[in-house]
Structures are given as structure tokens and as C-alpha cells.
């Protein structure tokens, strides 16, 4: 068969196979067009489950007479005009395929009038080439779309349609989802001439619960916990049912929206499921109605034919944000009091202060600073936590919105610098700027060695070895334990009986190293780790650490810190000059003994005199 261009009707029918799955798909596409047109009222009339008639009538802005023919053409849309528009979609539709696809598998009539026009116009496409005919009609401002005899010309598709009741139930579910997305729009759904659903527009926030109860039912409303959580350009609002009282009927309520677009996104569902994991049974599912607002540039909606899924550019960031938002409201509901007497106030981590990250027995202690209040969040869920507000995929700022008064006081105590003066440490003699320095970094050799010049000599320093010694110094506790950094997503691991026994024996020592965990019958949950481990792959490192502990008969913090320092992955596969200079500055400050007596494998002198003499003799 030779290559040939498909007829327009056949091409549209192929496209309809992706967009128009059943009558509910038609209703979704047409109602979304009405919402994009600014409609505040949409009437949906269905006959015989949508197989005979689907009529969508709205009071939107309407379509001009000159654009009616284009409205039924493929790839014709008013939503986007350039790639920049596509990368920042705010409308529900944008491809310009829905009307052309629907008209190719049904008898579609489009009637519309704008406020500027004195009369309405009606358009319909017919024939092999889908020629559009336009004629005058009577109609108020807005648009009406009638879809008759869906799949009349594609018997194979019509054969796969279900019963009238089943198809209408799918349409009813679509309208429920849209009603939850747009509280400001009145939606009326009729079937076979009988009004089945009427969702009146609500203007005030206090009335949203009324529509929520009408759609999701009173049991969900009674167990619903309100969420309002924000950080940067991300906002999460909505409701999640208390997992402790979730029933089988409630588990069917799982509605999530991204920028007002209804979604069935696996990433969002996984984040919510993980937040409720400790409170749900093995066969239970969370119930929720959640709305995620995100910068349109950070999400790609053009990845699914029916736009049921999206792709986030920073998926880990979004996952952790949703997880933390849901987890916070569930923790608030438990009303558990944090034991003040058992938790010492933790100083706020300042990235520039390397001493706060580990011990320093050699440098002069800094002057005590005045206590600082934590930064005021924009929302109740916007406070940044112990990781210095680093917005990385592995560590979202730890924040708890809407905490009760007692819990809020405890949380603020954990964030702020203690007002009491620290216990003075023995003051060491001031360091000699020349004797306690590795020298000047000249260049990077081989990607992981620094060429140093000091006092007329040239030396080669191994940066990974220096980094390992720095890690060990940061991990070894001094007079106080190493600062523990709470994990946004606790790491839950299955352990054997021997491994569990070893962890329990070493629990106090691990606590001094900043590693906090909880254990149950067969699992251990890592809750916090020291700062040097925040960017590590803990799913690999922690099981290896547990295996190491299980092989030991005695435990010491120095040995554990040394093992961790030797097994953490370097953050710099290829070192730069700036990274090398920063590392050496930290090593000179935290480990000055390495400058006085470098251990093996750290420094290697370069004999320039022999090289110079060899050149002179040539």
C-alpha cells in the first residue's frame, strides 16, 4: 500500500480514539471548554447515558461567527499561540483537538453568540472532508454544544459502550470532580429530562464545606482535616480524612487537582499514601480532596492524551512538599505532647558556621550570640527548619502548620538558639597563620588532587582523604552530641533480630552522633541524621551501617564515626578550585592536627629541585 495522506475525517477519528473513550470523555472536554470561556453556569443534559444526546450549555463569552468554522477544525485553539504559552498553560484545554475529534464520531452542532453580536450562529461539520456549514440561529450570549448519536459511524467503538446506567455514572463522576474544582460555577446535570445533580455556586469559603458534603458525603465531611500549606511557589489546600476513622466507603474519595486541573497522578497519590502509612491498615487507602498550586512553568501537562497526568520538573520537591503538608495536619490531629524534659534545645544551623556541624577541640570558641527568633512564615506552614532552609529535593524545610499552642512552643524552642550561655571550653592558643595552613592552592590535578605551594615547597594533597578526615571530625561528638537533622521522609527498613539487637545496644551512641531512630517488631525507622549525611543515599548507607554494627561486639562513637566517614560518598566527583579552597579552610579550622602531622595518604611532597637539576644538566 503506498504512503498517502489520510482523509480529515479518518484522521480525526483516529485522534478521537485517544481523546473520546466514552460519553464521559465528551462531557469532560466540553465542560472544560465552557470553564475556559469564563462560564459561571453550565447545564449538562444527557439522554440514554450519553449515547443518544449530550448537550452542554453555558453562559460564557461565546465564539464569534468568523471563528466558528475554525472551532471545529483540528489544531485550532484560542488558548495558546507560541511555545512559551505551551510551557505555562493555565487553561484546561490547549490542543484544539476535542471538537474536531468529537464531531468526527458523532453529529455535533455548535451554536454560539458573543455579547457584541446581535444574533447567534450555528455550525456543524459533515461529509468526508468535514466541511463546516454556518447558519443563523436563536441563542443567548454563550455557547451550546449538542452531540447526537455518539459513535454512530464507528460501530466497533459503540459496541464497547456499557449500559446506560454505567455510562451515566461515569458522567456523574466527572461532574463531581469538576464541581470540586470550581466552587464558583453552578453545574446542573440532567438525565432523560430529570434533574439529577444541582451544584450551586458558592462565593464564600465557609460555604465550600456545604458543597464538599453534598459531593463527598457527610461521613467524609465529619472526618475531614483541613490543610493549608505553602512554601515558595507551592501551595497545598484541601481536606484529608482522618486515617484512624477511614472506612471502605471513604477510600473511594481520592480527588487531587493541579492548578485547577483534575489529576490521577501517581506521584501525588504516593506522597499522600506515605504520609498516612503509619495510621492506615494494609488494605486501606487514604481519602482526600487536595488542590496543589504550582508555577505553570514547573509542570508539564502535555504528557497524556486526556490530560489525566502531569510531569513535574522537580518531582522530588513536589512529592516531599505534599508529604510534609499532609503529615503535619495528621500529626496535629494526634494531639501528642512533645516531651520537653527529654529534648534539649537545638541550635539553628547556620551554613557559614562549620563548627556547628561537628566538633572542634582546637579552635577558639566563638562568642555567644543573642537568641534569634525563627523567621516568620508567610503561611502557617512556611517556617524553615534545621537545614538552613535549603530547598533541595532531599531535604525540604521542616515546618509544621497550625500546631496547637503547646506543640508550637516546643517547636519554636527547637528552632531558636538557646538563650543560656554555653559552657565555656578551654581556650586553646591562637593558631599560627603560617604553621597551621596547608598553603595556597595552585591548581587541581587529576580531578581529585590539589597542588599546593607553601613556604617555597610544592605538595600534592588528596582531596577525598581530606574530606574523609573532615567528615570524621564533624561526626565525632565533643562535650555535646552532634546536632541531629530531622528527615523530611523517615527511612523505614526491615531488620533481622541480630541487627535489631545491635541497634538497641548502640542507640545511645548513635544518638550522640545525631542518628535517631525508632524500632518495632521487624522494622527500624530512621528519624534524623547528622548534617553531613543529609545529602547521602541513606537507603544504601544506613543498611550498610546496620550490618557493620551487627558484626561488632563492642561499640565506640569514634569507631562508628570513622566507619561512616570512610563510607560516605563524596559530594564532588570532580573538584574545582573553589571547592578545594573551601575544604582546606574547613580542615585547617576543624582539624589543625592534620596540618602539623599529616597522616599517610594525605600529602605527598613534589621534588622540584630534582626536576630543575635534571633540566639544567640537559
Curated annotation (Swiss-Prot):
GO terms for molecular function: ATP binding; ATP hydrolysis activity; ATP-dependent DNA damage sensor activity; mismatched DNA binding. GO terms for cellular component: mismatch repair complex. Keywords: DNA damage, DNA repair. SUPFAM superfamilies: ATPase domain of HSP90 chaperone/DNA topoisomerase II/histidine kinase (SSF55874), DNA mismatch repair protein MutL (SSF118116), Ribosomal protein S5 domain 2-like (SSF54211). Residues 382-392 have a biased composition (Gly residues). Belongs to the DNA mismatch repair MutL/HexB family. This is DNA mismatch repair protein MutL. It comes from Salmonella paratyphi C (strain RKS4594).
Amino acid at each position: 500500500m503506498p504512503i498517502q495522506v489520510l482523509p480529515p475525517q479518518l484522521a480525526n477519528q483516529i485522534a478521537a480514539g485517544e481523546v473520546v473513550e466514552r460519553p464521559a470523555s465528551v462531557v469532560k472536554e466540553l465542560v472544560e471548554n465552557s470553564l475556559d470561556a469564563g462560564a459561571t453556569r453550565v447545564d449538562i443534559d444527557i439522554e440514554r447515558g450519553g449515547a443518544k444526546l449530550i448537550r452542554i450549555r453555558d453562559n460564557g463569552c461565546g465564539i464569534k461567527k468568523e471563528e466558528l468554522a475554525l472551532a471545529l477544525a483540528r489544531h485550532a485553539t484560542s488558548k495558546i499561540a507560541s511555545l512559551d504559552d505551551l510551557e505555562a498553560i493555565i487553561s484546561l484545554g490547549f490542543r484544539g483537538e476535542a471538537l474536531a475529534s468529537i464531531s468526527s464520531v458523532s453529529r455535533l452542532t455548535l451554536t454560539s453568540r458573543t455579547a457584541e453580536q446581535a444574533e447567534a450562529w450555528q455550525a456543524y461539520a459533515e461529509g468526508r472532508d468535514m466541511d463546516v456549514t454556518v447558519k443563523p440561529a436563536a441563542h443567548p450570549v454563550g455557547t451550546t454544544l449538542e452531540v447526537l448519536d455518539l459513535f454512530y459511524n464507528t460501530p466497533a467503538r459503540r459496541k464497547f459502550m456499557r449500559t446506560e446506567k454505567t455510562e451515566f455514572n461515569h458522567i456523574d463522576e466527572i461532574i463531581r470532580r469538576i464541581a470540586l474544582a470550581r466552587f464558583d460555577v453552578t453545574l446542573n446535570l440532567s438525565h432523560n429530562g430529570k434533574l439529577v445533580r444541582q451544584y450551586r455556586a458558592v462565593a464564600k469559603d465557609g460555604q465550600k464545606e456545604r458543597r464538599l458534603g453534598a459531593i463527598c458525603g457527610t461521613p467524609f465531611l465529619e472526618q475531614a482535616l483541613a490543610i493549608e500549606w505553602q512554601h515558595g511557589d507551592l501551595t497545598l489546600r484541601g481536606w484529608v480524612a482522618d486515617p484512624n476513622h477511614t472506612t471502605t466507603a471513604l477510600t473511594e474519595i481520592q480527588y487531587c487537582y493541579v492548578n485547577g486541573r483534575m489529576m490521577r497522578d501517581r506521584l501525588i497519590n504516593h506522597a499522600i499514601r506515605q504520609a498516612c502509612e503509619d495510621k492506615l491498615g494494609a488494605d486501606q487507602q487514604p481519602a482526600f480532596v487536595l488542590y496543589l498550586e504550582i508555577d505553570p512553568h514547573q509542570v508539564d501537562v502535555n504528557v497524556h492524551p486526556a490530560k489525566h497526568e502531569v510531569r513535574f520538573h522537580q518531582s522530588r520537591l513536589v512529592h516531599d512538599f505534599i508529604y510534609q503538608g499532609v503529615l503535619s495536619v495528621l500529626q496535629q490531629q494526634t494531639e501528642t505532647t512533645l516531651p520537653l524534659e527529654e529534648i534539649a534545645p537545638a541550635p539553628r544551623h547556620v551554613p557559614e558556621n562549620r563548627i556547628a556541624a561537628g566538633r572542634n577541640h582546637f579552635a577558639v570558641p566563638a562568642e555567644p550570640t543573642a537568641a534569634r527568633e525563627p523567621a516568620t512564615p508567610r503561611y502557617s506552614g512556611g517556617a524553615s527548619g534545621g537545614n538552613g532552609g535549603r530547598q533541595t529535593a532531599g531535604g525540604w524545610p521542616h515546618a509544621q502548620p497550625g500546631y496547637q499552642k503547646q506543640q508550637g512552643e516546643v517547636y519554636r524552642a527547637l528552632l531558636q538558639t538557646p538563650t543560656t550561655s554555653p559552657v565555656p571550653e578551654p581556650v586553646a592558643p591562637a593558631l599560627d597563620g603560617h604553621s597551621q595552613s596547608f598553603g595556597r592552592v595552585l591548581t587541581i590535578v587529576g580531578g581529585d588532587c590539589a597542588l599546593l605551594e607553601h613556604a617555597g615547597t610544592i605538595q600534592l594533597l588528596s582531596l577525598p582523604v581530606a574530606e574523609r578526615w573532615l567528615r570524621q571530625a564533624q561526626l565525632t561528638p565533643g562535650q555535646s552530641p552532634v546536632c541531629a537533622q530531622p528527615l523530611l521522609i523517615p527511612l523505614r527498613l526491615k531488620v533481622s533480630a541480630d541487627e535489631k539487637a545491635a541497634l538497641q545496644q548502640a542507640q545511645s551512641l548513635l544518638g550522640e552522633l545525631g542518628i535517631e531512630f525508632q524500632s518495632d517488631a521487624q522494622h527500624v525507622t530512621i528519624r534524623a541524621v547528622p548534617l553531613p549525611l543529609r545529602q547521602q543515599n541513606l537507603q544504601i548507607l544506613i543498611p550498610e551501617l546496620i550490618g557493620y554494627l551487627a558484626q561488632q561486639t563492642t561499640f565506640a562513637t569514634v569507631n562508628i564515626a570513622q566507619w561512616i566517614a570512610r563510607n560516605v560518598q563524596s559530594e564532588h566527583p570532580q573538584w574545582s578550585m573553589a571547592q578545594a579552597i573551601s575544604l582546606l579552610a574547613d580542615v585547617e579550622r576543624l582539624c589543625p592536627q592534620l596540618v602539623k602531622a599529616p597522616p599517610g595518604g594525605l600529602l605527598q611532597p613534589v621534588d622540584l629541585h630534582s626536576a630543575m637539576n635534571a633540566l639544567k644538566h640537559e
